[in-house]
Amino acid sequence: MSPMSLQDQVATRRTFAIISHPDAGKTTITEKLLLYGNLIQSAGTVKGKKSGKHATSDWMEMEKERGISVTTSVMQFPYKGATVNLLDTPGHADFSEDTYRTLTAVDSALMVIDAAKGVEQRTVKLMEVCRLRDTPILTFINKLDRDVRDGIDVLDEIEDVLNIECAPITWPIGMGKSFKGVYNLLTDTTVLYKTGQGHTVQDVREVKGLNNPELDEAVGTDYAEELRDTLELVQGASHEFDLERFLAGKLTPVFFGTALGNFGVDHMLDGLVQWAPPPQPRDATARTVEADEPKMTGFVFKIQANMDPRHRDRIAFMRICSGTYRKGIKLKQVRTGKDVRIADALTFLAGERDNVEEAFSGDIIGLHNHGTIQIGDTFTEGEELAFTGIPHFAPELFQRVVLNDPLKSKQLHKGLTQLAEEGATQVFFPLRNNDVILGAVGSLQFDVVAARLKGEYGVDCRYEPVSVATARWVEADSDKELAAFERKAHDNLSRDGAGHLTYLAPTRVNLQLAQERHPDIRFRETREI
């Protein structure tokens, strides 16, 4: 068999992320996808919070304790001729920045909705992010094996709240204890549900034709009649699937099922492989980069410290945007201008790492990082270009970090700077004193940092309140203007972990006054990396 060309490799890639509100069942779906990709033999490993078994994709100590996905992990698996790259995103509300950046590295997204709760606040936020790039969205309405809301209601809510058209591909028959299966509107086939099959891929029974007497026999006449009546309503009130509108991010195909009961996930996966786009062109400073160009380019969207407690290492996650990675390739790190030879890139199955011989556009690889790689770094085979649109946000909460052992100050600085590189928190060093201030988007991040400083760096610390209301990165057209501002506003200025000058405002009013007094200084809420 001749090896596949780059064009063929790119055409088979599907790189997507899962977005959902916490507890909508995202981790369970991740497990089931791996089951269909033959990566795990039994998908009984996510019972999250109560049972002792832990989800395959939630591998950091703290996640194991809390049952939330705090870090984005990457999993690659084969399915029906495609190579699927799944990026798992943190489901907890505090981790929006990490999730935001992950969504810059995918070509499509799967939205998971709890059928009992409908559209929840976190999903709304994530959809706004997908909107910015018109990311195509598939929808899985989960937990049909529980008592849930009416399907038409849930679709109406998705259309109203998320402002996207819904095209149901499958439709549920019954729910809760009397959930019977789903009817596929495109193939005119009913797929029947049997309980207690959550751990393995089972053969399912299918009935062809909506008016087939076998259907009445299989689900009962009442349910069959109700399905026929409901479908008339559904087809009258909803949109038909339209590939162009889906690819433009305007319409979402909707699948119903139960991830825990291992039912319906494969229907969604079939849709993903059939309709979701392969790797797309990417905007860079100099030009747009096509996915099937022969030379390799890529950008780092995430850095994860200590993925392997045995190795005390940091891994930079890189999305390949064009070309082929081959072991030993020489790449230019555009920000520093340095050439690096990469012989030990990794691929992932949630904590299981393997050295990769080659990888293609659309794939995610891990680079060993000894402090030289930053989020947003572009790597090329020599060309001067940088991929755009990977943001840092100004934090909203601040605490002063106080060491319980003053002799550990060096380890504290190192630990905080490394953890800040991951992008979930930011560290600030005020110019006027030796304080260390930690900034975050949500309060859980402070707990995460304290736990990781202790567990991974041997640093015991506590937090104290600090009078900082908000932070802004400051820029000016000339170094002279910036230096003058630095003298005048010295008491409010700090450097962040990457050395950028930052204004820490004690109040919103103070920030407003500073902006009025210094019109030649730009106060930025986000910093493009």
Swiss-Prot record:
Residues 11-280 form the tr-type G domain. Keywords: Cytoplasm, GTP-binding, Nucleotide-binding, Protein biosynthesis. It comes from the Bacteria. InterPro entries: EF-G-like_DII, EFG_III/V, G_TR_CS, P-loop_NTPase, PrfC, RF3_C, RF3_dom_3_sf, RF3_GTP-bd. It is found in: Cytoplasm. Belongs to the TRAFAC class translation factor GTPase superfamily. Classic translation factor GTPase family. PrfC subfamily. This is Peptide chain release factor 3. It comes from Alcanivorax borkumensis (strain ATCC 700651 / DSM 11573 / NCIMB 13689 / SK2).
